[in-house]
């Protein structure tokens, strides 16, 4: 049967297409908006059955033009947290998602979709409960509002609905994201260009570079999506992070040591990297004060209860792999 991936030329969507290909799945309809044409590169090594613009797709899907569709991986969205056009964000992320959901429910199609940890805003608890959800920007609000729709329809849904609140995802095929690409991507490029990585200094009681995030490899994000694809009886909204908060220092230090290893140089401790000027701390910008999360960490209770028991890559493991992949692309 046919599979559909929206946002297929994007970061996570393209990784899902590639992972499906590795299982022998090629009857895939890739849906995206290639106004920014450089994203096509993410699909060059992938096999798909057809490509459709996102506007054409939603109309044809509702008409039943694709016959029996087993599953939709809905990864397409505007993920720019700095976007201020609320009308565009709500049309693109909320209204469009509702249209795809409605058709999946009518046709009995599995619906696996991208939510976001941005829903939690400034919360210090990251559990899938309404009382800790307080988005700080319109991107987070668009995701939050759609999750509320899901909560209302889940009790009566006859087919799978699985939403994943992605934390800080990094990995291959994110180059097109520019400023919204991961910290690992920017650290890699900065070190290659300047010979050092710059991190924020002390802020809000956190030592330089010790502000933390739940950094999750796109490899693990893809594996979780495919686990639920294989288990259509499992529905709900799930955090998708490692369950470990790791400091930005870990990202930067791993980037530096992996690039050193590729240059046949020995690893250095964080202290040695700082002493040698390979990591530099800059004053925390005034513009971000009061708007910056110093800590995120996914509560994995629901995900583990659903039966996903595979370990997640640490920053040291995942970023090392990613830097080696990036080095092979330049």
Curated annotation (Swiss-Prot):
UniProt gene name: hldD
GO biological process: ADP-L-glycero-beta-D-manno-heptose biosynthetic process; carbohydrate metabolic process
Functional summary from the UniProt entry: Catalyzes the interconversion between ADP-D-glycero-beta-D-manno-heptose and ADP-L-glycero-beta-D-manno-heptose via an epimerization at carbon 6 of the heptose.
Taxon lineage: Bacteria, Pseudomonadati, Pseudomonadota, Betaproteobacteria, Burkholderiales
Record's catalysed reaction(s): ADP-D-glycero-beta-D-manno-heptose = ADP-L-glycero-beta-D-manno-heptose
Organism: Burkholderia cenocepacia (strain ATCC BAA-245 / DSM 16553 / LMG 16656 / NCTC 13227 / J2315 / CF5610)
Entry annotated with the keyword Signal: no
Cofactor: NADP(+)
Annotated NCBIfam families: heptose_epim (TIGR02197)
SUPFAM superfamilies in the cross-refs: NAD(P)-binding Rossmann-fold domains (SSF51735)
Record-given protein name: ADP-L-glycero-D-manno-heptose-6-epimerase
Molecular function GO labels: ADP-glyceromanno-heptose 6-epimerase activity; NADP binding
């Amino acid at each position: 049967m046919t599979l559909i991936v929206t946002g297929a030329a994007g970061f996570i969507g393209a990784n899902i297409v590639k992972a499906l290909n590795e299982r022998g799945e090629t009857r895939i309809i890739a849906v995206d908006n290639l106004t920014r044409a450089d994203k096509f590169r993410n699909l060059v090594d992938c096999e798909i059955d057809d490509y459709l613009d996102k506007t054409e797709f939603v109309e044809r899907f509702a008409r039943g033009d694709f016959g029996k569709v087993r599953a939709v991986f809905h990864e397409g969205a505007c993920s720019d947290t700095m976007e201020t056009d609320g009308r565009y964000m709500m049309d693109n992320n909320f209204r469009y998602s509702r249209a795809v959901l409605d058709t999946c429910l009518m046709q009995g199609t599995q619906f696996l979709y991208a939510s976001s940890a941005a829903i939690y805003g400034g919360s210090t608890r990251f559990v899938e409960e309404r009382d800790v959800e307080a988005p700080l920007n319109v991107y987070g609000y668009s995701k939050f509002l759609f999750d509320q729709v899901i909560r209302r329809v889940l009790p009566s849904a006859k087919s799978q609905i699985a939403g994943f609140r992605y934390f800080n995802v990094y990995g291959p095929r994110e180059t097109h994201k520019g400023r919204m690409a991961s910290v690992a991507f920017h650290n890699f490029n900065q070190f290659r260009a300047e010979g050092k990585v710059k991190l924020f200094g002390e802020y809000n009681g956190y030592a330089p570079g010790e502000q933390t995030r739940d950094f999750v490899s796109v490899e693990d994000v893809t594996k979780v999506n495919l686990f639920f694809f294989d288990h259509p009886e499992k529905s709900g909204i799930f955090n998708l992070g490692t369950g470990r908060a790791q400091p930005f220092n870990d990202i930067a230090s791993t980037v530096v040591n992996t690039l050193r290893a590729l240059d046949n140089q020995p690893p250095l401790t964080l202290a040695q990297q700082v002493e040698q000027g390979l990591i530099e701390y800059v004053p925390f910008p005034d513009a971000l004060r009061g708007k910056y999360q110093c800590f995120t960490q996914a509560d994995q209770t629901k995900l583990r209860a659903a039966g996903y028991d595979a370990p997640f890559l640490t920053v040291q493991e995942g970023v090392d792999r990613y830097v080696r992949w990036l080095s092979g692309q330049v």
